[in-house]
Design a protein with these regions (language model features):
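Type III/flagellar secretion export determinants
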Residues: 1-199
Length: 199
């Protein structure tokens, strides 16, 4: 087992540890050795766009676009989603994400962007008005504001920093319910249900 504390939020064994106020995260997390799901590639897919998103540049107010589509080698039994990322100076990067190897309890933002768009394509009825990715980002932004996690929607860490996205949804579920914000509460339930299929 590979034990590290490098930019990992979430513990696959114990989702989160709280004090009586439910606002203290455990001081370190255990990261299981993962099958690599991401690969930076040169081949460009010409498939239909599944969804779009944006990443922030921490050095400026500029946001850069990203798009998800199926990779050319993707199949029904072995889905692979290609993520296109636009970067400063008109640079473009492409990442292939093997959906069968993504673990939402220990995943980067890039992996989750690919997974959410795949889920919405396969189960359109569960995507909500704006899609799973937008729902998850809203929850994540609230979790960051509450001090439960840190921002991984940045150019410098979206492909490297892993978080426990199921743990984040479960944590925010309590906050939303307590505040009477039932739409986001329901989003947390739906996302946890969908993500559990990939753990």
């Amino acid at each position: 087992m590979d034990i590290r504390v490098n930019n990992v939020i979430g513990n696959p064994f114990a989702e989160m540890v709280y004090d009586n106020q439910k606002n203290v995260r455990e001081p370190f997390q255990i990261q299981l050795e993962n099958k690599e799901s991401m690969e930076k590639v040169e081949e460009v897919s010409e498939g239909e766009v599944l969804g779009i998103g944006f990443l922030k540049d921490s050095d400026s107010d500029i946001s850069y676009g990203m798009a998800a589509r199926y990779a050319e080698e993707s199949t029904k039994d072995h889905p692979i989603v290609q993520v296109l990322l636009r970067k400063p100076n008109n640079e473009v990067e492409y990442y292939n994400v093997d959906i069968t190897k993504v673990n939402p309890a220990n995943a980067t933002e890039l992996e989750m962007f690919a997974l959410c768009n795949y889920m919405d394509d396969k189960n359109p009825g569960a995507r909500g008005k704006f899609g799973s990715w937008q729902a998850l980002k809203c929850i994540d932004i609230n979790a960051c504001s509450n001090g439960y996690t840190f921002d991984t929607g940045l150019l410098e860490n979206f492909a490297s920093a892993k978080k426990n996205w199921i743990g984040i949804c479960r944590m925010m579920m309590d906050d939303y319910l307590g505040a009477g914000i039932f739409k986001q509460y329901k989003d947390c339930i739906n996302l946890c249900s969908e993500f559990s299929k990939f753990v």
